[in-house]
Swiss-Prot record:
Family recorded in the similarity comment: Belongs to the UPF0714 family.
InterPro entries cross-referenced by the UniProt entry: Gamma_PGA_hydro, Gamma_PGA_hydro_sf
GO MF entry, a single one: hydrolase activity
Protein name: SPbeta prophage-derived UPF0714 protein YoqZ
Pfam families noted in UniProt: Gamma_PGA_hydro
Gene name of the record: yoqZ
Length: 274
């Protein structure tokens, strides 16, 4: 998906290079845009918004435009406790399943985390507000809910589960533990799932040290970005209320891959029976 976007951008740039930049019509349009921009900048009310927007545009680690809240404290102060739910389980320190955008934020990630929490430590933040669950999204580099930070500090490896928008059945695998990320990618493809290992500098790789997944005891993580269509295929009813209880064979096959990976590459390598 990312490569596809990059290709589109490149084509647009090339097209612009070939375009004619002369002519009175273009000059007239340019002057109009400059005039409007000047009026916008000199408006005292608009200036702070413009500065914030430019900062967000040129700073990839800043709050995403879609985020209503820049941290958990802001969310807590403005939202009813009934609009979200937090689940934690602490089994042992070897691995923590992390789903900070569960519920209606990135649909299907809750159910995956809950299923894995039956065997492993887990942290799950769920947006329950309908409509508007997406407003409870806090980007991973700003996610600082206290229970999450506390639980992470007690664990060695994080497997974070996210969702990204795509009509293709696909999983993007990232994280700071490149060796384990490559292994889980292979296991997914061997099981018939479409998956690819992202480069470390990819936007969805989750390698930023400020990413919540990397704030464990070692800084080692694996990040799974699962497409909308892949998550949809795991349930007979893909709604916030309908997903629970409608998990199908695709869901359990995906869980089986993650379980196999953890048991063989985390527990067995540590000399401990899962």
């Amino acid at each position: 998906m990312l490569k596809f976007k990059n290709r589109i951008v490149e084509k647009r740039v090339k097209g612009a290079e070939k375009a004619s930049f002369g002519g009175p019509v273009l000059l007239y349009r340019t002057l109009r845009k400059v005039t409007k921009l000047y009026k916008y900048i000199t408006d005292k009310k608009s200036f702070p918004i413009l500065v914030t927007s430019l900062f967000a545009l040129f700073n990839p680690n800043s709050v995403l435009a879609a985020d209503k809240y820049s941290n958990f404290e802001e969310l807590k102060e403005n939202e009813s406790p009934l609009s979200y739910n937090i689940l934690t389980t602490d089994v042992d320190r070897r691995v923590l399943i992390l789903a900070p955008h569960g519920g209606g934020i990135e649909g299907g990630t809750s159910e995956l985390a809950r299923e894995l929490s039956k065997s492993y430590s887990a942290y799950l933040f769920e947006g329950l507000r309908i409509p508007g669950a997406s407003e409870l999204h806090i980007t991973s580099t700003n996610f600082d809910e206290p229970q999450a930070l506390d639980l992470l500090s007690k664990h060695d490896l994080t497997i974070s589960i996210h969702g990204y928008a795509s009509s293709k059945k696909h999983t993007l695998v990232g994280g700071t533990d490149r060796e384990k990320a490559a292994k889980i990618t292979s296991l997914l493809t061997d099981a018939g799932f479409s998956a690819e290992l992202l480069s470390e500098d990819s936007r969805l790789a989750g390698t930023n040290e400020q990413n919540i997944a990397n704030k464990n005891s070692t800084g080692m993580s694996i990040q799974l970005e699962i497409s909308t269509e892949q998550r949809r295929e795991m349930f007979n009813t893909f709604t916030l209320a309908g997903r629970n209880g409608t998990q199908n064979q695709v869901f359990y096959d995906y869980i089986a891959v993650l379980t196999k990976f953890i048991n063989e590459n985390v527990y067995c390598m540590a000399g401990v029976a899962p």
